[in-house]
Amino acid sequence: MYLFSEYDTFWIYLSISSLIPILAFSISRSLAPISKGAEKATSYESGIEPMGDTWIQFRIRYYMFALVFVVFDVETVFLYPWAMSFDILGLFTFIEAFIFVIILIVGLVYAWRKGALEWS
């Protein structure tokens, strides 16, 4: 009887999860019709042909909100395992997590005072 070594399951999972997207893209590429032409290069907006120049630049104001969200989302990723093993890790880990949260709060206050969270 063959027993899996410690990493055999990992390598099987990795190879299957790599093979599935490769197969999906290969099948799509071989079966999908390829049509190149001027029609592919035109912009399409709700079935209406654009009038005038269609390239405009505009300021994206959501990036700072997204950046602050990502910071606090990463904070959650770090704090969740700590909270689940709080009783095992002890006081030193609590102090480390507390300092981590304080640094993030200082960063939030800094972003708030700089106007990063203002819409205008």
From Swiss-Prot:
Molecular-function GO terms, alphabetical: NADH dehydrogenase (ubiquinone) activity; quinone binding
One Gene Ontology term, aspect cellular component: NADH dehydrogenase complex
Domain of life: Eukaryota
Keywords: Chloroplast, Membrane, NAD, NADP, Plastid, Plastoquinone, Quinone, Thylakoid, Translocase, Transmembrane, Transmembrane helix, Transport
Chain segments annotated as transmembrane: 7-27, 64-84, 88-108
Record-level GO BP terms: photosynthesis, light reaction
Subunit text: NDH is composed of at least 16 different subunits, 5 of which are encoded in the nucleus.
Protein name as catalogued: NAD(P)H-quinone oxidoreductase subunit 3, chloroplastic
Organism: Cryptomeria japonica
